Regions:
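A short helix->loop->beta-strand "cap" motif at the edges of active sites that frequently abuts
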Residues: 48, 82-86, 120
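Active-site segments of SGNH/GDSL-like serine hydrolases
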Residues: 53-59, 76-106
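Generic structural signal for well-ordered alpha-helical scaffold segments
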Residues: 35-39, 77, 159, 163
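Alpha-helical scaffolding segments of alpha/beta enzyme cores, especially the outer helices
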Residues: 36, 68-82, 106-113
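Hydrophobic/aromatic beta-strand patches that form the interior of the parallel beta-sheet core
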Residues: 18, 88, 121-123
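Class I S-adenosyl-L-methionine
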Residues: 2-6, 81, 112, 116
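Catalytic His-Asp segment of secreted/periplasmic serine-dependent ester chemistry enzymes
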Residues: 93-174
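Conserved SGNH/GDSL esterase-like catalytic core that processes O-acyl groups on lipids
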Residues: 1-72
Length: 174
């Protein structure tokens, strides 16, 4: 998030971020823990917002279906909505595994639908990156993980596909 925050042009807005990421976390795990951890960082004196960055971890669980993943994300978003917390949902990124990507495309579409139905901003990182040469090269050289170029692409997508809308700020013109 450092790249996104560093490039955010909003001199009248003070932004603080607290990363609560857990590697390989499923949507079920996220649903169970997010409020307890995030609520300790929220304040009644500030405008509180939440970024949820989803992964492909749900694909590794045989017991988790797309419907279950949808429900888990819906529960997170519904709880946030009940507390008037705007959420920016960043979808999962593609892998180099074509079979996994086929399943991930379905999950991405489901997540987009859930966020859209609840009027939360969704940044689709999967669709623009799945065939992106630089993304794929970065994953190939980093044992399947994005490096500098990959993180730059994700930051660009976030900044240009919902970040300012979610913050309620005009998009910069330059």
């Amino acid at each position: 998030w450092g790249r996104v925050l560093a490039r955010t042009q909003a001199p009248d807005v003070e932004l603080e971020n607290y990363v609560l990421a857990v590697p390989h976390e499923t949507t079920e795990d996220l649903n169970e823990r997010w409020w307890g951890e995030a609520s300790r960082r929220f304040s009644e004196e500030t405008e509180n917002r939440l970024v949820v960055a989803l992964s492909d971890a749900d694909l590794d669980l045989e017991a988790t279906s797309t419907a279950r993943s949808r429900l888990n994300l819906a529960n997170v978003l519904d709880t946030a909505s009940q507390r008037n917390i705007p959420v920016l949902v960043v979808g999962p990124t593609p892998t180099l595994d074509e079979q996994r990507n086929a399943r991930l495309a379905e999950l991405n579409a489901a997540y987009l639908d859930v966020a859209d139905r609840r009027n939360h901003v969704y940044v689709d990182t999967f669709t623009p990156l799945v065939g992106h040469e630089q993304w794929r090269a970065d994953l190939a050289s980093g044992q399947g993980r994005p490096g500098q170029a990959g993180h730059g692409l994700i930051a660009w997508l976030v900044l240009h596909r919902g970040w300012y809308q979610w913050l309620g700020l005009p998009e910069p013109t330059a």
